[in-house]
Regions:
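Glycine-rich nucleotide cofactor-binding loops and adjacent beta-alpha elements
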Residues: 1-235, 412
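Conserved glycine-rich Rossmann-like NAD(P)H-binding loop of the short-chain dehydrogenase/reductase
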Residues: 76-90, 263-278
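Active-site helix of classical SDR
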Residues: 164-168, 352, 388-391, 396
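Alpha-helical segment proximal to the catalytic Tyr-Lys
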Residues: 177-178, 357, 401-402, 462
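Short, small/polar-rich loop/turn modules that mediate ligand/substrate recognition or access, typified
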Residues: 181-184, 212-215, 364, 404, ...
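Short C-terminal tail/terminal secondary-structure segment
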Residues: 214-238, 377, 465-479
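Residue(s) in the substrate-gating loop at a strand-loop-helix junction
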Residues: 372
Length: 479
């Protein structure tokens, strides 16, 4: 992955690293990422997880451990047991994976830490978190992963248990800010009905796919559709995806990753970008569609195209197209206000409704919207844009229960500072602040947004709906 971040490159050069250390300057670590469509080894390795040596722990009866043992075996992930959880060795062996005891004195460098905190029923029992991570953090390898599993607080049996489960959020967000060398941490609340639906989430978070996601909280609920048979090599094979705004930047990256994972991608963009979007579609073996999504006949044009390329219906719909018209509110014209709201959130709502009414969206369809940190934290000069992106989040939350009745899911990603042509044109001081004001000390890449969308669009992600996942390196802005 190329980057225009000169400081990142300098700080990791032979001379730059010495100078940064001498002056006490930050040294952001180049993040490990998956190969993209058409890159060397993409077909061989983009679909298979690099097995990260994982240390496993848990509190109480740790009800997720049996499922975790099976999933880690399926993913080919080797594991070690923390001293307080030696029963893990037998569980791993029973699942078909060799395991042993973690001993930090042996100099082992685990790539991941997993802790099942879902049985913690009081704040006193949170001490088990301290013990596990106090013993293991110093041994972590670079670009490591930390996953804490909990029980959704509203499902806890007692007020004391609910209180303790809610504490996990503050713990994980703080821990993510303490991690170094490109490591990340997440909290995954798992409802009892979702315990057998961890596959796509583990596949994502234990791999380089989740390079720029950290400090996030996701909830796996009662799945809205059944998990199909496991197929990690090209999991989207035989499926059709529509990506709007696909001619360049984040949209092109989304189309590229979905194509890498096997989807036929319909690349949609405005007529003036016809040449660019056609080039993207041709490269990916997809199909281009020139269409202004805000036009009154946009849904009809899209349905007509899908009737030809995907007569069985649409599996994945990604609302990526969007615009900015930045002005302070006092200087903003009504046209600048209205165009941003209409394209960024009005058009996606109309497309959703029209495709549902026409029966174009298949059962098990996944819809993903692209929101923004601006929609969460707000941003000066972006009242229109922030309102539209907050509305995307509202759209996801409002549509989730309605789509669940049809066995479909809807989620959103909220990117932070992503290295694109647009951010490259931002003034230097603002650009540098955007890059450094997160726990990973660097901007993200379009592929980071794309990989997160591919996780939410995975056929085995039926337990994820109504979720908003930030792709921001744990930005200091927003909640």
């Amino acid at each position: 992955v190329t980057t225009s971040d000169r400081y990142l490159a300098f700080a990791n050069s032979a001379v730059g690293s010495k100078l940064a250390n001498a002056l006490g300057l930050p040294r952001p670590v180049p993040l490990e990422r998956m190969p993209a469509y058409g890159e060397p080894d993409a077909d061989a390795s983009a679909h298979a997880i690099s097995p990260p040596l994982t240390v496993v722990g848990g509190a109480g009866d740790a009800p997720l451990l049996p499922t975790l043992a099976r999933e880690l075996h399926w993913l080919g992930v080797p594991s070690l047991a923390h001293a307080d959880r030696l029963d893990w060795i037998a569980r791993a062996n029973q699942a078909g994976t060799m395991s042993g005891r973690f001993n930090p004195a042996e100099g082992v460098r685990p790539k991941a830490l997993i802790f099942d905190a879902s049985a913690i029923a009081s704040t006193d029992e949170l001490t088990s978190l301290y013990t596990f991570f106090h013993d293991t953090l110093a041994s972590l390898d670079r670009c490591a992963r930390v996953l804490v599993f909990g029980l959704p607080p509203h499902l806890a049996a007692t007020p004391q248990a609910s209180t303790a489960q809610r504490a996990l959020e503050g713990f994980v967000r703080s821990l993510a800010k303490e991690l170094k060398r490109g490591a990340t941490a997440q909290l995954l609340y798992v409802a009892p009905a979702a315990r057998e639906s961890l596959h796509s989430t583990l596949r994502f978070f234990l791999s380089p796919r989740a390079a720029y996601v950290s400090g996030q909280v996701a909830t796996l609920q009662d799945p809205v559709f059944d998990t199909p048979p496991m197929r990690d090599q090209r999991p989207l094979s035989g499926q059709t995806a529509v990506v709007t705004g696909a001619a360049r930047g984040i949209g092109e990256a989304i189309a590229t990753v979905l194509a890498r994972d096997g989807a036929h991608v319909v690349c949609v963009d405005i007529p003036s970008a016809q040449e660019a979007v056609s080039a993207v579609a041709t490269k990916l073996g997809g199909s281009p569609l020139s269409c202004d999504i805000a036009a009154p006949d946009a849904a009809a044009i899209l349905r007509a195209h899908l009737a030809v390329v995907a007569p069985a219906g649409l599996d994945i719909l990604v609302h990526n197209a969007g615009i900015t018209r930045d002005k302070t509110l006092a200087r903003m014209s009504e046209a600048q206000w209205q165009s941003v709201l209409d394209i960024n959130v009005g058009a996606p709502q109309r497309l959703n409704a029209a495709l549902l009414e026409a029966g174009t969206l298949r059962e098990r369809a996944r819809i993903v919207g692209v929101a923004s940190i601006s929609g969460i934290a707000g941003n000066r000069g972006q009242t229109n844009y922030a309102a539209s992106k907050a509305a995307v989040i509202g759209m996801v939350e409002a549509w989730a229960p309605l789509l669940a009745e049809r066995h479909m899911s809807i989620n959103a990603v909220a990117p932070g500072f992503i290295e694109t042509q647009m951010t490259a044109a931002v003034p230097f001081a603002i650009r540098e602040a955007g890059r450094r004001m997160n726990s990973l000390g660097q901007g993200g890449q379009p592929v980071d947004v794309a990989e997160t969308i591919a996780w939410l669009a995975h056929p085995a992600s039926g337990a994820l709906t109504g979720q908003v996942v930030r792709v921001c390196g744990q930005s200091l802005l927003g909640a």
